[in-house]
Amino acid sequence: MNTVRVTFLLVFVLAVSLGQADKDENRMEVQEKTEQGKSYLDFAENLLLQKLEELEAKLLEEDSEESRNSRQKRCIGEGVPCDENDPRCCSGLVCLKPTLHGIWYKSYYCYKK
């Protein structure tokens, strides 16, 4: 009986020690793979970041060109007095002398075209 116990104990100790070695090996392999994966992910992340920055620069450039050309400065609305030499009427309005109901004011007003 003792020999069976000793044999069983010996096999158990060997299995545990070999299992620990395999566990350490597996842990090292997993660490190496994650480090390689991290370096690959860092590379992919940097590449994606560069592409996004390029796209953002292009979009901002287009927006700035659009806003520079199409932006309307402060304007005067319909029925508001304006200066005939420097009309600042909004788009779709023209600075004209009033016809009937504003003749006595002697100034120009913004009217629809």
Curated annotation (Swiss-Prot):
UniProt note on tissues of expression: Expressed by the venom gland.
Keyword Transmembrane helix: no
One Pfam family this sequence matches: Toxin_22
GO cellular component: extracellular region
Propeptide residues according to the Swiss-Prot or TrEMBL record: 22-74
Keywords of the record: Disulfide bond, Ion channel impairing toxin, Knottin, Secreted, Signal, Toxin
Designated name of the protein: U11-theraphotoxin-Hhn1a
Organism: Cyriopagopus hainanus (Chinese bird spider)
